[in-house]
Design a protein with these regions (language model features):
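Class I S-adenosyl-L-methionine
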Residues: 1-50, 121, 135-156, 160-230
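Class I S-adenosyl-L-methionine-dependent methyltransferase module
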Residues: 41-139, 144-145
Length: 230
């Protein structure tokens, strides 16, 4: 599913260097669930996302819910957080441009390539993704409050330092302190553009994203995304 900062295109490369086989796999920043949906062979999979509406949406999809078409009027109402949590989550992500939380209504649009029904595309992708999320446990809390079993493989895709476009500011310094503590009893991997000296770079990938390392959002920006291990 399209989601701002999604790892859909990078999941295969990242999983090549993380041995998840037989491990408890935990994602504190699961977002659009594209990464965890690609994880195979883990003992268990747990997805945490602080946005409760997104979590409610995925829980509903995994349970067999088929989202309805969202009109502009629906979108405006749901944007005010009036409605069922899972429907708000669907409108906020799947019915918004580039998967940005209520970043503009996406419906049927005339493009240079022809007519595109963005909601239909999102629905088809979501139903396929829901099949790959069977067996995943979900939670919605701050990463610091997440209970992580000892020995887990923890993959973190936090909001990147110096980027814009996310709903709230993110304290990257506090996050890295938490990651260092967590690495005492787990294998911790972090996707970022840069990291403190105590993290080891193990993968470097050129990407194009709507969030660039120079802090500018919007459009397509070329960046080098890295994977670090603690």
């Amino acid at each position: 599913m399209k989601y701002m900062g999604s790892k859909a295109r990078l999941s295969a490369k990242i999983l090549e260097v993380m041995d998840v086989s037989g491990r408890d796999y935990v994602e504190p920043f699961a977002g659009g669930m594209n990464m965890i949906a690609a994880v195979d062979g883990a003992n268990s999979r747990h997805a945490n996302e602080i946005n409760k509406y997104v979590v409610a949406m995925f829980e509903a999809l995994v349970s067999g819910w088929v989202p309805p078409h969202i009109t502009r009027e629906d979108y405006s109402r749901l944007r005010m957080l009036i409605g069922d949590d899972h429907v708000i989550g669907w409108a906020g992500i799947a019915c918004s441009y580039s998967g940005k939380w209520f970043g503009g209504y996406a419906g049927v649009v005339e493009t240079k390539q022809g007519v595109r029904d963005y909601q239909k595309e999102a629905l088809n992708n979501a139903l396929k993704q829901a099949e790959k999320l069977q067996g995943v446990s979900f939670s919605s809390c701050c990463y610091r409050d997440l209970e992580i079993p000892d020995g887990s493989l923890v993959y973190c895709d936090p909001p990147y330092a110096g980027t814009t476009g996310y709903k709230d500011s993110f304290d990257s310094v506090s996050f890295w302190r938490w990651a260092k503590r967590t690495a005492r009893y787990c294998d911790v991997y972090v996707s970022e553009y840069a990291a403190p000296d105590f993290a080891t770079e193990i993968l470097s990938m050129p990407v194009k994203s709507s969030l660039s390392a120079n802090g500018v959002s919007g459009g397509s920006k070329a960046s080098v995304e890295k994977l670090f291990k603690l």
